[in-house]
């Protein structure tokens, strides 16, 4: 038990440069607290308990802002960074050394029963705000970009970004999709709100030009 707790703490030191001391990690890292609470609730869930595991899960959500269903299966080495808003569904399965950032959802589509949440392979990174929805597999060493919405299977060593998610890299090499597209990095993801505002601004500008033209014609 203590060996596993020690490993949980070491994972944070390995992946978070902001970690300064063991006591800071133990008392101040909500992701670690969520994992510990889940470990307890999951054991009870596997023994056939229903209410108590859900109560523990709800208390953990209140304390940490992270919601992990007691039925979710989580491998060793999970690192949750800035975990507020993370949701992990009942039938989700996480492999070893997975990294999740704030706002990530590993959820279902609302249309399925039974296995309805994603399976995340070993060493996968899911960046801030990404949504992985459905009962498919995200292959080992894959990366999901911030704000992406992934609705279908991701092969190993792929990098996926955008809405809906598209593969832009495989094994670290850019994928040529035959499109005049930019190389979508973390700092170059699409901005739907910005694009919408730009379109509205352009539309208003065109209307103003038409009004000006009509006013000139009426004055003649």
Label each region the model flagged:
Residues 61-168:
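Structural signal for interior beta-strand "rungs" in well-ordered beta-sheet cores
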């Amino acid at each position: 038990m203590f060996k596993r707790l020690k490993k949980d703490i070491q994972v944070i030191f390995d992946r978070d440069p902001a970690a300064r001391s063991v006591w800071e990690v133990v008392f101040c890292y909500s992701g670690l607290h969520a994992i510990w609470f889940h470990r307890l609730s999951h054991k009870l869930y596997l023994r056939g308990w229903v209410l108590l595991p859900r109560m523990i899960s709800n208390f953990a959500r209140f304390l940490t802002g992270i919601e992990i269903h007691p039925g979710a299966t989580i491998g060793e080495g999970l690192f949750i960074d800035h975990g507020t808003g993370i949701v992990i569904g009942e039938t989700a399965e996480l492999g070893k050394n997975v990294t999740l950032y704030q706002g990530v959802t590993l959820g279902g589509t609302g249309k399925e029963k039974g296995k309805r949440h994603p399976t995340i392979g070993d060493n996968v990174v899911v960046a801030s705000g990404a949504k992985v929805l459905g009962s498919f597999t995200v292959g080992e060493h894959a990366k999901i970009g911030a704000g992406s919405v992934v609705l279908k299977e991701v092969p190993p060593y792929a990098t996926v970004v955008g809405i809906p998610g598209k593969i832009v890299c495989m094994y670290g090499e850019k994928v040529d999709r035959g499109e005049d597209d930019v190389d979508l990095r973390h700092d170059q993801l699409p901005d739907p709100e910005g694009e919408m505002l730009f379109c509205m601004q352009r539309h208003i500008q065109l209307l103003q030009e038409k009004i000006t033209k009509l006013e000139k014609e009426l004055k003649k």
